[in-house]
Amino acid sequence: MDVSKAVDQRISTRAFLPDPLPEAEVREWLTQAQRAPSGGNVQPWRTIAVTGQAKDDVIAMAAPILAADPRGQKTDRPIYPKDLWEPYEARRRRVGEMMYEALDIPREDRAARLAWFSNNFRFFGAPLALFLVIDERMGHGQWGHAGMYLQTLALLAEERGWGTCFQECWGCLLYTSDA
């Protein structure tokens, strides 16, 4: 598969087969992604992969937090800037509307929307979850390099026929937990 095709067909996958990915292939994928651009070769990211029981433990850790607030806890690191401005807010709302329309969940059915949203905290059934960690002291450039690493992971996953879904929502739990 060429890069253009991988870019064109990559989507956020929200339904996964339960089959585990071969560990050797996962290691190869993660190693290859380390070739992502990084100024000064700083590679400011750390990737934590969880599968099997470890993944189940992470999901279980999230359960009591989500029982208190299905959207996660409030943090000083919101997913979106406060009072997101146009045209960004319209884009964000439209993609949400399209997703819930495709799922046949009406706008007024808040309970069904929150139930669907809670699938984020079960990784949509994916057999592998990755957490990207970066030291907060890193500058804007290094955060950008981490983004290039994530894009590289996504495109290499697409090449392998693996779906991906980037989930910032976990930050609402992990920044405020002992995880």
Task: Enumerate the language-model features and the residues they cover.
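Conserved small/polar residues in nucleotide/adenosyl-binding loops
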Residues: Y175-A179
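Extracellular/periplasmic catalytic domains that process cell-envelope and extracellular macromolecules
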Residues: R122-G125
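N-terminal amphipathic, basic helical "cap/leader" segment at the start of enzyme domains
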Residues: M1-N120
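Small-aliphatic-rich amphipathic alpha-helix that forms the alpha element of a beta-alpha
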Residues: W29-R35, L128-L174
